[in-house]
């Protein structure tokens, strides 16, 4: 059935969905999974294929009136946990945030690593997650608790040793199906794919990639931004004109043990460079929710709120939520 694909021919959406469902079943061999992931790595993924993969792995839950801010990782920038910090800031400003994330697979410091260190207890079901979201405006869903089929790919992904399509599929599989998404990608070729999935799925989304490779809005390079609603538009942000010069050592570290402290001090406003970086990446969350009309307004509102101490107090609340 899949011989033509293995020779490089693109698949339609339905065939791609069938293929991913088969690969996510115990009947599929690791050799076949490795072959498919390798072909996709070499020739790339079409929008129809990505849509089929998404539909195969995404549980058909009701859409949640909330926002997720997530990055693909893989940029090797070793920055603080900025999307998680931005999610906390946005929720402390009154927005409903359903954050989806994982631990680091690269030996650095992932979003779930940071949340664990705050004392946060991950919800184990969508029902529990929705209750948390209702109580506090914030919930963090730990990806392996909800993407159990991904465990079948673990051995193959480790053996292959390169990022596969699953690295880019996982971040958009939030089981609460938030209607609004801010998605950062380290691979610019996935921007149009994410925009296509968002448009075809009825999401509102902001897709972003920075020219220095960050899957965040970088303070050191221009960021390309795609805005998705009924239509897709594009813009660019020169973040340095908003933040001023930032010291890299205040927002990034090759030492995983230092990342949590830098992230926490940014949320508290003690690390001003970190706070500016977090405010910069909170801006698109405010924009997509109608709380800011542009990046400058969103950045300034988020930074003022961080420096007021609101996010630091809010973090104490969600860390104790059970």
From Swiss-Prot:
<dbReference type="InterPro" id="IPR000312">
    <property type="entry name" value="Glycosyl_Trfase_fam3"/>
</dbReference>
<keyword id="KW-0808">Transferase</keyword>
<feature type="binding site">
    <location>
        <position position="215"/>
    </location>
    <ligand>
        <name>Mg(2+) 2</name>
    </ligand>
</feature>
<dbReference type="InterPro" id="IPR005940">
    <property type="entry name" value="Anthranilate_Pribosyl_Tfrase"/>
</dbReference>
<dbReference type="GO" id="GO:0000287">
    <property type="term" value="F:magnesium ion binding"/>
</dbReference>
<feature type="binding site">
    <location>
        <position position="102"/>
    </location>
    <ligand>
        <name>anthranilate 1</name>
    </ligand>
</feature>
<feature type="binding site">
    <location>
        <position position="157"/>
    </location>
    <ligand>
        <name>anthranilate 2</name>
    </ligand>
</feature>
<keyword id="KW-0822">Tryptophan biosynthesis</keyword>
<feature type="binding site">
    <location>
        <position position="71"/>
    </location>
    <ligand>
        <name>anthranilate 1</name>
    </ligand>
</feature>
<comment type="function">
    <text>Catalyzes the transfer of the phosphoribosyl group of 5-phosphorylribose-1-pyrophosphate (PRPP) to anthranilate to yield N-(5'-phosphoribosyl)-anthranilate (PRA).</text>
</comment>
<dbReference type="GO" id="GO:0005829">
    <property type="term" value="C:cytosol"/>
</dbReference>
<keyword id="KW-0028">Amino-acid biosynthesis</keyword>
<feature type="binding site">
    <location>
        <position position="83"/>
    </location>
    <ligand>
        <name>Mg(2+) 1</name>
    </ligand>
</feature>
<protein>
    <recommendedName>
        <fullName>Anthranilate phosphoribosyltransferase</fullName>
        <ecNumber>2.4.2.18</ecNumber>
    </recommendedName>
</protein>
<dbReference type="InterPro" id="IPR035902">
    <property type="entry name" value="Nuc_phospho_transferase"/>
</dbReference>
<feature type="binding site">
    <location>
        <position position="71"/>
    </location>
    <ligand>
        <name>5-phospho-alpha-D-ribose 1-diphosphate</name>
    </ligand>
</feature>
<feature type="binding site">
    <location>
        <position position="79"/>
    </location>
    <ligand>
        <name>5-phospho-alpha-D-ribose 1-diphosphate</name>
    </ligand>
</feature>
<dbReference type="Pfam" id="PF02885">
    <property type="entry name" value="Glycos_trans_3N"/>
</dbReference>
<dbReference type="GO" id="GO:0000162">
    <property type="term" value="P:L-tryptophan biosynthetic process"/>
</dbReference>
<feature type="binding site">
    <location>
        <position position="216"/>
    </location>
    <ligand>
        <name>Mg(2+) 1</name>
    </ligand>
</feature>
<dbReference type="InterPro" id="IPR036320">
    <property type="entry name" value="Glycosyl_Trfase_fam3_N_dom_sf"/>
</dbReference>
<keyword id="KW-0057">Aromatic amino acid biosynthesis</keyword>
<keyword id="KW-0328">Glycosyltransferase</keyword>
<keyword id="KW-0460">Magnesium</keyword>
<dbReference type="Pfam" id="PF00591">
    <property type="entry name" value="Glycos_transf_3"/>
</dbReference>
<feature type="binding site">
    <location>
        <begin position="74"/>
        <end position="75"/>
    </location>
    <ligand>
        <name>5-phospho-alpha-D-ribose 1-diphosphate</name>
    </ligand>
</feature>
<feature type="binding site">
    <location>
        <begin position="81"/>
        <end position="84"/>
    </location>
    <ligand>
        <name>5-phospho-alpha-D-ribose 1-diphosphate</name>
    </ligand>
</feature>
<comment type="pathway">
    <text>Amino-acid biosynthesis; L-tryptophan biosynthesis; L-tryptophan from chorismate: step 2/5.</text>
</comment>
<dbReference type="InterPro" id="IPR017459">
    <property type="entry name" value="Glycosyl_Trfase_fam3_N_dom"/>
</dbReference>
<feature type="binding site">
    <location>
        <position position="111"/>
    </location>
    <ligand>
        <name>5-phospho-alpha-D-ribose 1-diphosphate</name>
    </ligand>
</feature>
<feature type="binding site">
    <location>
        <begin position="99"/>
        <end position="107"/>
    </location>
    <ligand>
        <name>5-phospho-alpha-D-ribose 1-diphosphate</name>
    </ligand>
</feature>
<keyword id="KW-0479">Metal-binding</keyword>
<comment type="subunit">
    <text>Homodimer.</text>
</comment>
<feature type="binding site">
    <location>
        <position position="216"/>
    </location>
    <ligand>
        <name>Mg(2+) 2</name>
    </ligand>
</feature>
<dbReference type="GO" id="GO:0004048">
    <property type="term" value="F:anthranilate phosphoribosyltransferase activity"/>
</dbReference>
<comment type="similarity">
    <text>Belongs to the anthranilate phosphoribosyltransferase family.</text>
</comment>
């Amino acid at each position: 059935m899949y011989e033509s694909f293995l020779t490089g021919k693109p698949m339609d959406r339905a065939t791609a969905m069938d293929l991913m469902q088969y690969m996510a079943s115990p009947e599929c061999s690791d050799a076949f999974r490795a072959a498919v992931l390798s072909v996709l790595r070499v020739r790339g993924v079409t929008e129809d294929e990505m849509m089929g993969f998404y539909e195969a792995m995404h549980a058909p839950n009701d859409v949640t009136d909330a926002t997720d801010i997530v990055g693909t990782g893989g940029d090797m920038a070793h920055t603080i946990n900025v999307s998680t910090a931005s999610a906390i800031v946005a929720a402390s400003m009154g927005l409903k945030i359903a954050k989806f994330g994982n631990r680091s697979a690269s030996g650095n410091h992932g979003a779930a690593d940071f949340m664990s260190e705050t004392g946060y207890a991950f919800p184990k079901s969508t029902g529990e997650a929705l209750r948390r979201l209702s109580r506090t405006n914030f919930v963090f869903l730990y990806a392996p608790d909800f993407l159990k089929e991904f465990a079948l790919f673990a051995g193959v992904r480790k053996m292959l040793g390169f990022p596969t399509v699953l690295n880019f599929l996982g971040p958009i599989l939030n089981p609460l199906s938030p209607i609004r998404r801010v998605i950062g990608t380290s691979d610019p070729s996935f921007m149009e794919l994410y925009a296509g999935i968002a448009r075809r799925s009825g999401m509102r989304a902001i897709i972003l990639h920075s020219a220095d490779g960050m899957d965040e809005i970088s303070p050191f390079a221009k960021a390309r931004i795609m805005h998705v609603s009924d239509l897709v538009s594009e813009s660019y942000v020169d973040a340095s004109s908003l933040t001023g010069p930032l010291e890299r050592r205040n927002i990034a570290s090759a030492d995983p043990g230092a990342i949590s402290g830098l992230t926490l001090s940014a949320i508290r406003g003690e690390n001003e460079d970190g706070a500016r970086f977090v405010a910069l990446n909170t801006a698109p969350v405010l924009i997509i929710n109608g709380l800011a009309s542009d990046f400058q307004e969103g950045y300034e509102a988020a930074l003022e709120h961080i420096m007021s101490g609101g996010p630091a107090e809010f973090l104490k609340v969600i860390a104790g939520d059970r």
